[in-house]
Amino acid sequence: MKNYRAIGLAFTFTALSSLSAFAASLPGGASTLQETYQDWTVSCQSQKDTTACVMRQEQSSAQAGQRVLTAELRNVAGGKVDGVLLMPFGLDLAKGASLKIDDTAGPNLTFSTCLPQGCLAPVSFDAKQVAALKSGTNINVTTTALSPSQPVAFKISLKGFGAALDRIQALTK
């Protein structure tokens, strides 16, 4: 279990280091911060006068205890949210994935690469979609298993999404 936690933290801090930095500092002069907002975790890293934050949700298999999905998002200019979904191996990468915010169609995703932890699908939500995320219940992700070829569905809870996003925006002003 510690190995998966370490992989998750490595993934987070790799993502944090690649984000554009913001001129802000964390409360109390801390160099890192981690807070939980219902089903979302806010993770921030501060170096000198820059702070980068992401919000993350990890889902694990109840049977095996292994991570099956990680959603990692950050706010960008214009009220948009960008990020990545880390999904398990065994999916038909050529078919990508589709998202719905509750029952409303969202962006279609294309897998960009695979890492030892799983396969990455970049995601971007415009301001209108972000408003729907803040008031929604779930992001419904549908993709296809490679063999046998059948639909695979994931639900990403939006409990705490708005509070986590507001916190990231406040910390990176």
UniProtKB/Swiss-Prot annotation:
Domain of life where this protein originates: Bacteria
Q: Which UniProt keywords apply?
A: Signal
Q: One Pfam family this chain carries? A: IalB
InterPro entries per the record?
Answer: IalB_sf, Invasion_prot_B
The leader peptide range reads 1-23
Q: Give yes or no: UniProt keyword Phosphoprotein.
A: no
- State the family it belongs to: Belongs to the IalB family.
Know the name of this protein?
Invasion protein B homolog BMEI1584
